[in-house]
Amino acid sequence: MMRLAVNTYFFGILVSLILMGCSSGSEVNTGDNEFKNGNFKSAVAGYSENLKTKPNDYHLYYGRGRSYQELGKLVEAQADFERALALEPTNFQALLGMSNLQLERKNYASALLYATKAEEIPGAPALASLLKGRALHQIGLPEEALKAYGIAIQLDKNFGQAYFNRALLKIALKRNKQACEDFKLAMVLEYPGAEESFQKYCN
């Protein structure tokens, strides 16, 4: 259930990032439309077609990489994210995509590197700090992970997943009272799994 909730959240926010970064101004290309509708194979085809005429458009590589990721083609996804970053090294979309991908592949040090780079870019979303927190947690640096989750919450007070992840980490650290406060906040924000976790750990 936790993995489903996390993936659903990432899908939603990364769709938003794709549409925010549309390469053709107000016009959304075929790949973006197909990705938004969950048609990932068609999205790959759409992005590939656009790349024939716009081979240096980092947004198209990022979008195709996200589509490959949703199809479980992680090698192809990483290659496209790397192409996007070669064209635009400070693009936080591609950095977040790489961080998320490395978390999925359990390459936590690499995930931390990309998340940290994204976090340092002005205007980067709270997701960068969340991914940094997840990587730090997996590496075994819980206090640093708590700080990263806290930064994510400072950037976005309505970030249910940040409260939820911080609560789970606090449970692991036996700080149940603090964890329950975070579960409550995640519940108010209707984050999936928060109510069940509150019932499990706080009653």
Language-model regions: role of each:
Residues G63, E70, G97, L131, ...:
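Canonical tetratricopeptide repeat
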Residues A172-N203:
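Terminal, low-structured helical/coil segments at or just beyond the last alpha-helical repeat
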